């Protein structure tokens, strides 16, 4: 599966007590190559899980691959930040929107539909838990 990983998915995958853990495990079983993400998502995930070592293991074991350098996309990130200023987007979301622009056929795996239904290039394809 070629996709982009958001924080909510990674937190659900790493926390067996998360309400979406079973869903995240099912998604992870379908992963055949590392999911694309960014350093901001990894930092958020480490914060929410309170476990940097686990997040580093996600990278080391090939679940995810940081595929984005902020400095290389700073102009576009600033444009996106201005465009969505009313939503107060965080850096992780801005980076994922940019990743989705760079990889338009890759859905974003997320538990955060409220933001990703607003952030759009045309329509950002999403994979999310049922019922969201």
What does each of the following model-derived ranges do?
Residues 7, 39, 93-94:
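Conserved glycosyltransferase catalytic-site signature
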Residues 10, 94, 98-99:
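Short, hydrophobic/amphipathic alpha-helical patches that form generic packing surfaces
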Residues 11-14, 92, 117:
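Generic, ordered loop/turn and secondary-structure boundary motif
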Residues 111:
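Conserved residues at the C-terminal ends of beta-strands
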Residues 3, 22-88, 98-106, 117-132:
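PIN-domain endoribonuclease scaffold, especially VapC-family toxins
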Residues 1-18:
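Metal-dependent nucleic-acid phosphoesterase active-site entry motif
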